[in-house]
Amino acid sequence: MAIVKCKPTSPGRRHVVKVVNPELHKGKPYAPLLEKLSKSGGRNNNGRITTRHIGGGHKQHYRLVDFKRNKDGIPAVVERLEYDPNRSANIALVLYKDGERRYILAPKGLKAGDQIQSGVDAAIKAGNTLPMRNIPVGSTVHNVEMKPGKGGQLARSAGAYVQIVARDGSYVTLRLRSGEMRKVQADCRATLGEVGNAEHMLRVLGKAGASRWRGIRPTVRGTAMNPVDHPHGGGEGRNFGKHPVTPWGVQTKGKKTRSNKRTDKFIVRRRSKK
């Protein structure tokens, strides 16, 4: 893994910082594990914008990543590491002993030729997936399930991890990167180690066009709009003289957005204040 700063041969290259991984596969992805991915432009079935700042971008295929890791007792060999345009983490193509191939999230330190396994009898090493009742307290894990059999939902992006800090009967307590402490059923699965490609956060796109390649459109400030377009719009100069709100008048900056009170009992401690 190398961090490359581009030479300023043009204004668009001047600030570019790339993360280069020579171990990534340079050919095409494994076709049977690809799916068509169509663009929505942020519109719903009525043609109305439901998510702003989305549009354009390079064509992509969706890689079918195995988040469940439920092929127990069958060892697999890592064939290669690949780039995935749909996520910040890299993925690994693994070949199981019975001939099946699957994509998994590539944990830190995983390389071609390594062996991985899932199940209660899997060894305690990076890349193996076990129920959390079988993982030692203090271990660092990723791709953590929140319901048994549903597939990993927590800690899936580049460099992410969760720490198992306690085990109490049928529940384990996890410490998330945000500082939140949360209880999850001990039968939920997790993959040992942390997600690879942690250097992803160090990259610098360098120009607006690089965001457009990724399907991200510009974000216009409300205070730069007219009163008809945004509550912050209009006026002389840059002041808007009121509490910050969204384009629809809902208070922002500090307003609580969590509404799922049913699962509040599983949150032992709220995330840390910044």
UniProtKB/Swiss-Prot annotation:
Region annotation (Disordered) ranges: 221-274
GO MF terms held by the record: RNA binding; rRNA binding; structural constituent of ribosome; transferase activity
GO biological process: cytoplasmic translation
SMART domains: Ribosomal_L2, Ribosomal_L2_C
Coiled coil region boundaries: none
Database matches in SUPFAM superfamilies: Nucleic acid-binding proteins (SSF50249), Translation proteins SH3-like domain (SSF50104)
Keywords from the named record: Ribonucleoprotein, Ribosomal protein, RNA-binding, rRNA-binding
InterPro entries: NA-bd_OB-fold, Rib_uL2_dom2, Ribosomal_uL2, Ribosomal_uL2_bac/org-type, Ribosomal_uL2_C, Ribosomal_uL2_CS, Ribosomal_uL2_dom3, Ribosomal_uL2_RNA-bd_dom
GO cellular component: cytosolic large ribosomal subunit
Assembly: Part of the 50S ribosomal subunit. Forms a bridge to the 30S subunit in the 70S ribosome.
Family designation: Belongs to the universal ribosomal protein uL2 family.
HAMAP family, alphabetized: Ribosomal_uL2_B
Function: One of the primary rRNA binding proteins. Required for association of the 30S and 50S subunits to form the 70S ribosome, for tRNA binding and peptide bond formation. It has been suggested to have peptidyltransferase activity; this is somewhat controversial. Makes several contacts with the 16S rRNA in the 70S ribosome.
Record's protein name: Large ribosomal subunit protein uL2
Lineage: Bacteria, Pseudomonadati, Pseudomonadota, Gammaproteobacteria, Enterobacterales
Name of encoding gene: rplB
